[in-house]
């Protein structure tokens, strides 16, 4: 891997700075499709609410993320950035942001060792300063500081890695502690809070909070309605098949496609596949989600039942070993297997290590079993839409990232209102604000309640219009 570091600046690592011009042109296009972020820039640029914020960002380094980064900077923040996935970086986006002077450490196809090196670098600020905010996706940046601080007190927490990724992470922490025995606790003490982007990271935060281990306040961005019901659903509805088709050129129509998990992400995936006239089967553990899938006309089965019959498999659960080695051994020759959940362990990729691997092209592999049968594994079990394509469209990411920006402002400027160790969601009026910022772009014209109508249903004329417990 030929990473590029500018010797005069030496505070970024990207694949090729010559790609910066291309990245800048795509950023300009993305800005026209991200009205929420651009409106927030206009609203807050003068007041600079993030002045003094030093944000350590760990989120897919895409063009859309570039617009987020430049919005945070426009509002006064200083930012250091790494990707939260080894395959999700768009190298031209990383170069374009690095060219502006914002430190970026991200390369598409980086190794696990490089991944954790780069995640450490977002906490290595010059002149003895430290990050005071985290913007996270999947929770790795948050995990790094907490686990490292625990290891300072008890190195045995690093004794038994449960996966290759943990082995690399634990080694990186040990190496860092060898240089500075207080590296993690020093930085952890400076953090005011974290805003977390995705389901998996939010799950981690709630676990840490319940155990009394979370060292700062957190805002759960994922469960804002304008994130989970848009990014997770509509974003995946477009980006899943983009990734599958770029990787394989497969004809989806007529195929049997299995979607594991029928949450918001799984719903979007199922809608996309059925729109291309696949026969969609769903696997579920939750009776409510299973009933929803059945009522939409999908066949709900077990993975054991589906394995031998389907042509395309998509995991969307956020769980562990949803597709096992045994399942894959039962699959058809040339079955396509991919994941759209955050981590790579939804598919038991580690269980395939003793199979023969044949790279077809980057992020597309034949896995050949002893009997000669092959499956096509996409993105090595990591996010297919970002590993094999470019992720969600700009418009839907504007909604997600508007939530992230507002959450950063909330947590930084009103930190005393958020209790250390607790996880919060943004209030309803801010969720509705994010939605409003995107209506004009789609030509939407809202109706307005009269005072009498508002009184009749017991809401303010200007909203919020739904109670917090309302399920959209």
UniProtKB/Swiss-Prot annotation:
Q: Which residues bind substrate?
A: 62, 137, 197, 227, 231
Q: Which CDD domains match?
A: SAHH
Entry EC no(s)? 3.13.2.1
Question: Its domain of life?
Answer: Bacteria
Cofactor(s) for this UniProt protein: NAD(+)
Cofactor: record remark: Binds 1 NAD(+) per subunit.
Q: In which pathway does it act?
A: Amino-acid biosynthesis; L-homocysteine biosynthesis; L-homocysteine from S-adenosyl-L-homocysteine: step 1/1
**Keywords for this protein:** Cytoplasm, Hydrolase, NAD, One-carbon metabolism
Q: Which Pfam families match?
A: AdoHcyase (PF05221), AdoHcyase_NAD (PF00670)
GO biological process, alphabetically ordered? L-homocysteine biosynthetic process; one-carbon metabolic process; S-adenosylmethionine cycle
GO molecular-function annotation terms?
adenosylhomocysteinase activity
Q: What is its main location?
A: cytoplasm
One GO term describing the cellular component: cytosol
Name the reaction it catalyses.
Answer: S-adenosyl-L-homocysteine + H2O = L-homocysteine + adenosine
What residues bind NAD(+), as annotated? 198-200, 232, 261-266, 284, 319, 340-342, 385
| InterPro entries in the cross-refs | Adenosylhomocyst_ase-like_sf, Adenosylhomocysteinase-like, Ado_hCys_hydrolase_NAD-bd, NAD(P)-bd_dom_sf, S-Ado-L-homoCys_hydrolase_CS
Subcellular location per UniProt equals:
Cytoplasm
Q: Which family does it belong to?
A: Belongs to the adenosylhomocysteinase family.
- Biological role: May play a key role in the regulation of the intracellular concentration of adenosylhomocysteine.
Q: Which NCBIfam families match?
A: ahcY (TIGR00936), PRK05476.2-3 (NF004005)
Q: Enumerate the HAMAP family for this protein.
A: AdoHcyase
Q: What is this protein called?
A: Adenosylhomocysteinase
Query: What is the name of the gene encoding this protein?
Result: ahcY
């Amino acid at each position: 891997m030929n990473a590029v570091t500018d010797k005069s600046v030496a505070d970024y690592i990207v694949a090729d700075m010559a790609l910066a011009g291309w990245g800048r042109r795509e950023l300009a296009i993305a800005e026209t499709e991200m009205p929420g972020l651009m409106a927030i820039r206009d609203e807050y640029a003068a007041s600079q609410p993030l002045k003094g914020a030093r944000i350590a960002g760990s989120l897919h380094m895409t063009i859309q993320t570039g617009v987020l980064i430049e919005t945070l900077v426009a509002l006064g923040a200083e930012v250091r950035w790494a990707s939260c996935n080894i395959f999700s970086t768009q190298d031209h986006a990383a170069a374009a942001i690095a060219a502006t002077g914002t430190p970026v450490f991200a390369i598409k196809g980086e190794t696990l060792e490089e991944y954790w090196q780069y995640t450490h670098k977002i906490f290595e600020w010059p002149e003895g300063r430290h990050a005071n905010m985290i913007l996270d996706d999947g929770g790795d940046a948050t995990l790094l500081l907490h686990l490292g601080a625990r290891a300072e007190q008890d190195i045995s927490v690093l004794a038994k890695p449960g996966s290759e990724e943990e082995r690399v992470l634990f080694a990186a922490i040990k190496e860092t502690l060898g240089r500075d025995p207080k590296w993690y606790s020093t930085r952890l003490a400076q953090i005011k809070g974290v805003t977390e982007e995705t389901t998996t990271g939010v799950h981690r935060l709630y676990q840490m909070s319940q155990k009394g281990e979370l060292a700062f306040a957190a805002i759960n961005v994922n469960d804002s309605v304008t994130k989970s019901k848009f990014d997770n659903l509509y974003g995946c509805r477009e980006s899943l098949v983009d990734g599958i088709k770029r990787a394989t050129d497969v004809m989806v129509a007529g195929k049997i496609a299995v979607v594991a998990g029928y949450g918001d992400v799984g719903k979007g995936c199922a809608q996309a596949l059925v729109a291309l006239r696949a026969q969609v089967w769903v696997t579920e553990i939750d009776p409510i989600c299973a009933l929803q899938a059945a009522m939409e006309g999908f066949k709900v089965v077990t993975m054991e039942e589906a394995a031998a019959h389907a042509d395309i498999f998509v995991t969307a659960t956020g769980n562990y070993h949803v597709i096992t080695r045994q399942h894959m051994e039962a699959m058809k020759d040339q079955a396509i297997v991919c994941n759209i959940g955050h981590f790579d362990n939804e598919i038991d990729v580690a269980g395939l290590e003793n199979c023969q691997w044949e790279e077809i092209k980057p992020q597309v592999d034949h896995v050949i079993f002893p009997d000669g049968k092959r499956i096509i594994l996409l993105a090595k079990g990591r996010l297919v839409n970002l590993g094999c394509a470019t992720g969600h469209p700009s418009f839907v990411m504007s909604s997600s990232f508007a939530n992230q920006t507002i959450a950063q402002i909330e947590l930084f400027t009103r930190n005393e209102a958020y209790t250390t160790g607790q996880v919060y969601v943004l209030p309803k009026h801010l969720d509705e604000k994010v939605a409003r910022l995107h209506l004009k772009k789609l030509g939407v014209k809202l109706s307005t309640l009269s005072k009498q109508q508002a009184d009749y249903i017991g809401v303010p004329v200007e909203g919020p219009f739904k109670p917090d417990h309302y399920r959209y």
